[in-house]
């Protein structure tokens, strides 16, 4: 956007300030200045059940989103367009301000299958799940006296939803509405980039490795060697080389 003459402002967690500003992009901090990685790891560490752990982590993130709406609202003022991330921050605030939005979805599973015919039972179950997902966003909508959203689709942009995933990596869901568009991966070419020597040597020593990236699941409050061992043994058994994200304490 900047290269094409647009003046952009990126709002995110305070921990990203240095990285974003080093790329010559204007930045505004949103939310509390806490160690998200550590907090998520602590929450996950208190629950042995992975599903319960995931739900508690999501509630933690949603709570931050709800409490940060005032900061988001101020950051959105005066903008011509709001690009909304998969967390939907900025969507409701843009609606209140009358500013058009474009969505960027990193998790295609969150996109509603509006074109799919549903049985009565599936409609009932789907409506319940959709209502639960929309619940934290309805807390924000209530602050601005907006009608509750029945599902996440009512919050998402009806203009464009850009999905930065390659069509060769994942098939487009035929039940999505037309404005959900696969764009291919967004990687900026860095002509002068040189990988670290250790990484460069590893890549040259054999077949292309698999990259295992687990997002917040790999954040650690304390060493989780057993979990890391599980992945390492799986790669050893299948004979694949791998690069594993996270697990710094293990």
Per-range role (PLM):
Residues 1-6, 19, 234-238:
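A short, Lys/Arg-enriched amphipathic alpha-helix followed by its capping loop at the start of a domain
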Residues 7-13, 241-246:
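Short internal beta-strands
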Residues 9-54:
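Conserved nucleotide-sugar phosphate-binding/catalytic loop shared by glycosyltransferases and other
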Residues 51-59, 113-144:
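Alpha-helical membrane-targeting segments
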Residues 62-127, 168-169:
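Conserved nucleotide-sugar donor-interacting segment of glycosyltransferase catalytic cores
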Residues 80-81, 160, 209:
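Structural motif
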Residues 132-179:
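A short, active-site helix/loop in glycosyltransferases that binds the activated sugar's phosphate group
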Residues 171-250:
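Donor-nucleotide binding loops and adjacent catalytic segments primarily
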């Amino acid at each position: 956007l900047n290269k094409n003459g647009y003046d952009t402002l990126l709002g995110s967690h305070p921990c990203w300030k240095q990285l974003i500003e080093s790329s010559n992009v204007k930045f505004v901090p949103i939310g509390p200045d806490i160690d998200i990685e550590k907090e998520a790891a602590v929450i996950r560490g208190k629950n042995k059940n992975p599903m319960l752990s995931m739900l508690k982590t999501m509630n933690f993130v949603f709570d931050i989103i709800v409490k940060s709406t005032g900061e988001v609202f101020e950051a959105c003022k005066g903008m011509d367009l709001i690009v909304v991330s998969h967390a939907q921050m900025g969507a409701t605030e843009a609606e209140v301000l009358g500013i058009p939005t474009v969505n960027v979805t990193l998790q295609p599973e969150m996109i509603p299958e509006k074109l799919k015919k549903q049985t009565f039972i599936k409609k009932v179950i789907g409506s319940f799940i959709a209502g639960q997902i929309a619940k934290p966003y309805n807390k924000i909508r209530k602050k601005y006296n907006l009608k509750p959203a029945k599902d996440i689709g009512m919050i998402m942009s009806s203009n464009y939803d850009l999905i930065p995933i390659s069509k060769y990596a994942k098939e487009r869901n035929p039940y999505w509405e037309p404005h959900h568009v696969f764009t291919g991966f967004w990687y900026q070419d860095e002509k002068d980039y040189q990988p670290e020597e250790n990484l460069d040597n590893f890549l040259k020593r054999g077949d292309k490795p698999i990259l295992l990236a687990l997002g917040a699941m790999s954040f650690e409050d304390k060493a989780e060697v057993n979990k890391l061992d599980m992945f390492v043994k799986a790669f050893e058994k299948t004979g694949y080389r791998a690069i594993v994200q996270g697990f710094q304490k293990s």
